[in-house]
């Protein structure tokens, strides 16, 4: 009986850990699809929590470029569990543009426009 209670407690704790981790991962899923509608080739994409004063050092495109009219899936593990993020795109002509306050808990697709506007869903 004593071992049964210990086993039941251990299994309950394990179930809570497994389901709690899955729920946490679902809540903090911040991956999204990024569409380039700027008219220019994007050579780098940087993300930053809206409240931060610096961009992440990691270029989300890696060695790739994002040509006009194309899209890419951004799969990242945020170092900050922030809800709102900013995006900085650097273009092949040396210029850049920034867009602000994307709720990555609820947005799954972002289309960047060169005029500083973005469409998201």
Roles of regions detected by a PLM:
Residues 55-80:
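Intrinsically disordered, low-complexity Pro/Gly/Ser/Thr-rich segments with frequent PxxP/GP/PP motifs
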Residues 19-26:
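Sec/Tat signal peptide C-region and signal peptidase I cleavage site
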Residues 34-39:
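Asparagine-centered strand-capping/turn motif at beta-strand->loop junctions
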Residues 9-19:
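Bacterial N-terminal signal peptides
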Residues 82-92:
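A short, solvent-exposed beta-strand micro-motif common in secreted/extracellular proteins
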Residues 1-10:
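Bacterial N-terminal signal peptides that target proteins for export
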Residues 40-44:
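Short acidic/proline- and small/hydrophobic-mixed sequence motifs that coincide with surface turns
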